[in-house]
Amino acid sequence: MRLSDLAAALQLPAPETDPQTDTEVTGVTHNAAWVQPGSAFVAIRGAKFDGHSFMEQAQAAGAVAVLGEGLADGQTSPLPYLTVPNARAALADAAAALAGHPSRELKVVGVTGTDGKTTTSWLTRHLLRSAGLATGLLSTVGYELPDGELRHFPAHFTTPEAPQVQDTLREMVAAGAQATVLEASSHALSLDRVRGVDWDVAVWTHLSSEHLDFHGTLDNYFADKRKLVERARFAVLNVDDPWTAQLRGIAPGETTYSAENQHADWRAQDIEERHSGLHFRVVSPAGDFQAELPMIGRFNVANALAGMAAAHHLGATALQLQAGLASFRGVPGRMELVPGGATSPRVIVDFAHTPPSLEKALGTLRATTAGHLWVVIGSAGGPRDPYKRAPLGEVATRLADHAILTEEDCRDTPLQDILNEMERGAREEGRSNFVSIGDRREAIRYAVTHAQPGDTVLLAGKGPEDTLERATETLPWNEVAEARAVLAER
């Protein structure tokens, strides 16, 4: 794509170019370290850095143009410069244009919410595949082409930057995908990482307090997540979430779901939690049928209803949904059972890292635990929502018999400060059934070693993440492998 064509795609005035400067643009990035020959470099003014400071570095790496919101007084660009109203929006729009708008060639389902979006994304992908649609997936765990092989992005985020999103969607199309499911975080929606994606279906799970360090207020957090519903042609809405009332009627079409409310379009009846998983009756526009889902946790009924509603909108039948649920094997790091021997406690790895999700996880495991319930839990450092640290300590000590408080990506926040806050949440309620062990590996060892057969140990917060971030280092991490190593020593 020529630079003049890119300007036209962004609805910008034609740049002053000649045959030499109207060069071919082959990619776009906002990171000068990622520039390849032929790239357009988007200079974004952020809280800490101004991308315009890296224009010469981008030029040296082979960039052919710069896009930005305007040069400062006295500043010049070493490359042709396109002035845009919003640099992040331009990054996304340019990425979509250069990739040929791949989402227009796919049926795209977006899933957002504080909790439940990863399980719902994986389940929706599985249901669509069970219905015969070659389906890709882009989620916090990684991304999949229709071949089912899980690939990972080399970063610690839920949704990659806009160029990676568009390139991945193009890769899916090239691999024969007919549909894809994309997990959309509030950061991705706020920072325009998923701008330029053509959404067929938006799935809303629920909203609770998280990432307020970034969004400032819960209302702002909601407003960013709401963007997905505003941009979709069809919405799948959870009527058990109070925020849903503000989402009704926004999308051209919608349906509702609930594990509790019998007035929802998609609803569950006669829910049973068995050793083999969940059994319930589905009442829906697709018909009424008996469902079996081999997953732990009553809350997964709502995730299943959301996935079924989305898949049905894209053509899945009741029989296909029923078969798809029965064959679903869950998500790595989401209520994942770590294999152990007959004399070992049951060890579960789960991503639960907010007070509501931790409460759900512990409540679920309590119902099927004959002995004591243990939890290993930390809270993220940096500026990331310090307000949930004390509530996490309160929930952990209220619902578990033994709580081990530890690290979880403390970054540049002193670990002891985080532990003190979590301990405060427990002590203010008069509880002392906890111990603080700063090193997460040692915390896991302590819990798994001290737990007895019949006990359950929940390793909460990390799930499938493959790094552990500390102030001065980032360690490779595998929570399941850590648990297996301790179980093997018993």
Swiss-Prot record:
InterPro entries, alphabetized: Mur-like_cat_sf, Mur_ligase_C, Mur_ligase_C_dom_sf, Mur_ligase_cen, Mur_ligase_N, MurE/MurF_N, UDP-N-AcMur-Glu-dNH2Pim_ligase
Binding sites annotated in the UniProt record for ATP: 113-119
Keywords of the record: ATP-binding, Cell cycle, Cell division, Cell shape, Cell wall biogenesis/degradation, Cytoplasm, Ligase, Nucleotide-binding, Peptidoglycan synthesis
Residue stretches spanning the membrane: none
PTMs per UniProt: Carboxylation is probably crucial for Mg(2+) binding and, consequently, for the gamma-phosphate positioning of ATP.
Gene Ontology terms: biological process: cell division; cell wall organization; peptidoglycan biosynthetic process; regulation of cell shape
A GO-annotated cellular component: cytoplasm
Pathway note: Cell wall biogenesis; peptidoglycan biosynthesis
Residues annotated to bind UDP-N-acetyl-alpha-D-muramoyl-L-alanyl-D-glutamate: 158-159, 185, 193
Top-level class of the enzyme under EC nomenclature: ligase
Family according to the record: Belongs to the MurCDEF family. MurE subfamily.
Annotated function: Catalyzes the addition of an amino acid to the nucleotide precursor UDP-N-acetylmuramoyl-L-alanyl-D-glutamate (UMAG) in the biosynthesis of bacterial cell-wall peptidoglycan.
Cross-referenced HAMAP family: MurE
The protein's name: UDP-N-acetylmuramyl-tripeptide synthetase
Organism: Deinococcus radiodurans (strain ATCC 13939 / DSM 20539 / JCM 16871 / CCUG 27074 / LMG 4051 / NBRC 15346 / NCIMB 9279 / VKM B-1422 / R1)
